[in-house]
Design a protein with these regions (language model features):
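Conserved H-loop
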Residues: 152-158
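Short helical segment in ABC ATPase nucleotide-binding domains corresponding to the A-loop/adjacent helical element
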Residues: 59-67, 77, 81, 170
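Helix-to-loop junction immediately C-terminal to a conserved catalytic motif
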Residues: 14
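Conserved signature/switch motifs of ABC ATPase nucleotide-binding domains
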Residues: 97, 118
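ABC ATPase NBD coupling module
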Residues: 31-44, 68, 73
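Catalytic Walker B motif of ABC-type/P-loop ATPase nucleotide-binding domains
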Residues: 123-126
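Conserved ABC ATPase "signature" region
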Residues: 74-93, 146
Length: 175
């Protein structure tokens, strides 16, 4: 239900807020002992309606963390092209556009691949498909499942839709 703490839980996992009690462990390590920047750069985060930076091109949105990390420009470009291909979007056609020039489904695809661009071990998804039409939503659910299988990431997916949870998840926690 609304207000039960789903989004708050994601924010605690990536240390945007501090838990009032208890501990959160990742691979047996308390997240409070992990440097916040290091923790967050090892976590992709996808929010409802993409959360793309409107003043940046699609390329800039996808590549921002890799550039902050100082990765090789050629490798960044190749990774961006590979990720675009994985979600069936033509890099030449879309990378120089701005988020406002994309449909809602395209923006969500970019949000997902931006979360994956720095090759994080974990991806947090906070109702990423809730504002989309049923056909786009179903298509993105399938694409996310395929990405999960191909990339082998731990994904924590928040949704109000039990059918969506059953379709995507291999484990479900009900709050």
């Amino acid at each position: 239900p609304s207000g039960c703490g789903k989004t708050t839980t994601l924010k605690m996992i990536n240390r945007l807020i501090t838990a009032s009690s208890g501990r959160i462990l990742i691979d047996g390590e308390d997240i409070e002992s992990i440097d916040k920047v290091k923790l967050r750069r090892n976590m992709g985060y996808v929010i409802q309606q993409g959360g793309l930076f409107p003043h940046m091109t699609i390329r800039q949105n996808i590549e921002i963390i890799e550039k902050l990390e100082g990765k090789d420009e050629y490798q960044i470009l190749k990774n961006t092209e590979r990720l675009m291909e994985m979600v069936d979007m033509d890099a030449e056609k879309f990378l120089d556009r701005y988020p406002s020039e994309l449909s809602g489904g395209q923006q969500q695809r970019i949000g997902v691949i931006r979360a994956l661009a720095n090759d994080p071990d974990y991806v947090l998804l906070d109702e990423p498909f809730s504002a989309l039409d049923p056909l786009t939503r179903s298509s993105l659910q399938d694409e996310l499942s395929d990405l999960h299988r191909k990339m082998g990431k731990t994904m924590i997916f928040v949704t109000h839709d039990m059918d969506e949870a059953i379709k995507i998840a291999d484990r479900i926690c009900i709050m």
